[in-house]
C-alpha cells in the first residue's frame, strides 16, 4: 500500500530525521564521533539548505547546524 504513495523530494523547510541504519554504514560515520545524540535519529530537524547531494539541517536545540547526505535523511511525518 505504501508503494503507491509517491515519495516527495526533500526541500528547504522539510522536517527530517537521520536514518540510523544508513548513517552507521557511511563514510561520514567513520569520520565522525561515534557517540551521536539521539535527537538526530528521532527528529524533527529542519532542512535549511540543499547543495548537490547534501542538506544542512537545523535541530530545535542550541546546537550547530549539520550537513548530511540526502540519502541519509528521511522525511519526519507528524502524527496527528
From Swiss-Prot:
E.C. numbers: 7.1.1.-
Record bears the keyword Protease: no
Entry annotated with the keyword Translocase: yes
Domain of life from the UniProt record: Bacteria
EC category name: translocase
Keywords, alphabetical: Membrane, NAD, NADP, Plastoquinone, Quinone, Thylakoid, Translocase, Transport
Protein's recorded name: NAD(P)H-quinone oxidoreductase subunit O
Gene name of the encoded protein: ndhO
Amino acid at each position: 500500500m505504501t508503494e503507491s504513495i509517491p515519495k516527495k523530494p526533500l526541500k528547504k523547510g522539510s522536517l527530517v530525521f537521520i536514518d540510523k541504519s544508513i548513517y552507521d554504514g557511511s563514510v561520514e560515520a567513520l569520520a565522525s564521533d561515534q557517540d551521536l545524540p539521539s535527537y538526530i535519529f528521532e527528529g524533527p530537524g529542519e532542512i535549511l539548505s540543499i547543495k548537490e547531494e547534501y542538506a544542512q539541517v537545523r535541530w530545535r536545540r542550541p546546537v550547530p547546524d549539520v550537513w548530511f547526505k540526502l540519502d541519509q535523511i528521511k522525511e519526519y511525518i507528524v502524527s496527528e
